[in-house]
Amino acid sequence: MKKKISQAIIKFFKNENLIIDESKLIIEKSKNFGDYSSNVALIFAKQNKIDSLKLAQTIKNQLLSENLNLEKIEIAPPGFINFFISKNEYANIVSEIIQKGENFGRYSLQKKINLEFVSANPTGFLHLGHLRGAVIGDILANILEFSGNFVFREYYINDFGSQIDRLVGSVFSRYQQIFKKFPLPEEAYLGEDIIWCAQKFFQIYANKFENSSLDDLEAYKIFREKSIEIFLDEIKADLANLSIKFDVFSSESELFRTEKVQKNLANLPFVYKKEEAIWLKTSKFGDQKDRVLVKKNGEFTYFSSDIAYHFEKINSNFKPDFLINIWGADHIGYVDRMKAALKTVNLNQKLDILLYQLVKLFKNGQEFKMSKRMGKTFTIKDLLELVDQDAIRYFISERSYNSLVEFDIGLAAKISLQNPLFLIQYAHARASKLLANSTIAPEKKLKFEAENETILISKLKQFEEIVLKITKNYKINLLNKYLLELANLFNSFYSNSKIIGNQNQNSLLSLTKAVQIVLKNGLKLLGIKAKERI
């Protein structure tokens, strides 16, 4: 309805050759002034040299002549327009939802989107920081696909450089400690996961490398490849346990092996040499300073391979319309330089970067700390032992990506209406149980009169708006908020309405069916089961 009203107003302005800026046209949901309200006449009256009340009245007359299923339109000084939806429109909304079923809320945007997320270094188990990026990325991909886009989910493996050297040294030292006292490198990873990896390595190779040194290139190569493989397999297993999938795992080291880094940098403009190093003039394109691509010792920087990686994505066979990267907030200093690099070849408009904030985990009022370096990492494995997948996905996604998440294990595990996820699943289970024991007559005309019915139906229709909004602002938490509001409205409706035996029973059952459909569709986008019973 909101879209219909907007389109009718735009059509009116164009037919009358009046000035309108469509981006400033606002149709707001209203509680006190009809179902929807707009100040469009106030905004554009001056530009069109028309009195705002007169313009509002003219718009009203035109829209009443359109087939918009509006019961009435009222004008309020100095030019507000209030729209009241026809009772028939509420019936139409419920019928539409039931008819479309699992397709209600879908669009056909048909953009190709490369979505890169998680991309954790294969130097240990996934922890809560990685978890948030994983959940955000997976849910966003679900919603973008539901909106008719083609989404390519990519995990970038940072398997090149100093962090991998540190991993090899750490695992090798822990392996040696199986046989004898052996010192850890100064920059060693200290987590239990490194000890676990060394033991895995021992199960495969026994004492084959007991007397080896990392100066032995063959030994170094085996420790490097096997350590990465062991951790990457665990990362994939953790993601699978959260129902998170990828289309491809891309390797940084593979970019170097196939000389794609060198080839992409060779065609990069605004490159210059200074102090025996090779630089990119990113300061010309919004970065704070120029950045080194190749150090004076000939070593490529991480930035150089990252540029190549982005060019490879853009020029891939998938041919994406744009890229979305989901990074931790600690990468904030990296955003400007990456966008600047793409600006050098006029591709910056193809990249959106989401920076998500930290997760703090609480249990019994105490916060768990996370530090892979200090051996106190709280991993996804640990969390899955305390709460289930559905709870993890809901509570990790219920805040905007740019806000801190405080994950309360006690609340997430609580079987109570205080738990928002339980409340939503309870509403779905209530609807499912009622419908399982009842029959809807689809041929009967639907009728909705009571205020709690029309409010609930209006909320159902908002599902389409929420989905579309998320495709534009990427704030997946809007879906959590919406589902909670819908569940609360339905639970109130259910508790305060006599449904079975009501003279309008068929309509109320149909409304219940519509609620069940929308709750299920929304939960599916979150990757959460819609429970039939609790």
Curated annotation (Swiss-Prot):
CDD domains: ArgRS_core. This is Arginine--tRNA ligase. Its EC number is 6.1.1.19. GO terms for biological process: arginyl-tRNA aminoacylation. Pfam families: Arg_tRNA_synt_N, DALR_1, tRNA-synt_1d. The keyword Hydrolase does not apply. Monomer. One of its GO terms (cellular component) is cytoplasm. SMART domains: Arg_tRNA_synt_N (SM01016), DALR_1 (SM00836). Belongs to the class-I aminoacyl-tRNA synthetase family. The gene is argS. It catalyses: tRNA(Arg) + L-arginine + ATP = L-arginyl-tRNA(Arg) + AMP + diphosphate. Gene3D superfamilies: Arginyl tRNA synthetase N-terminal domain (3.30.1360.70), HUPs (3.40.50.620), Isoleucyl-tRNA Synthetase, Domain 1 (1.10.730.10). It comes from Mesomycoplasma hyopneumoniae (strain 232). InterPro entries: aa-tRNA-synth_I_CS (IPR001412), Arg-tRNA-ligase (IPR001278), Arg-tRNA-synth_N (IPR005148), Arg-tRNA-synth_N_sf (IPR036695), ArgRS_core (IPR035684), DALR_anticod-bd (IPR008909), Rossmann-like_a/b/a_fold (IPR014729), tRNAsynth_Ia_anticodon-bd (IPR009080). SUPFAM superfamilies: Anticodon-binding domain of a subclass of class I aminoacyl-tRNA synthetases, Arginyl-tRNA synthetase (ArgRS), N-terminal 'additional' domain, Nucleotidylyl transferase. GO terms for molecular function: arginine-tRNA ligase activity; ATP binding. A motif ('HIGH' region) lies at residues 120-130.
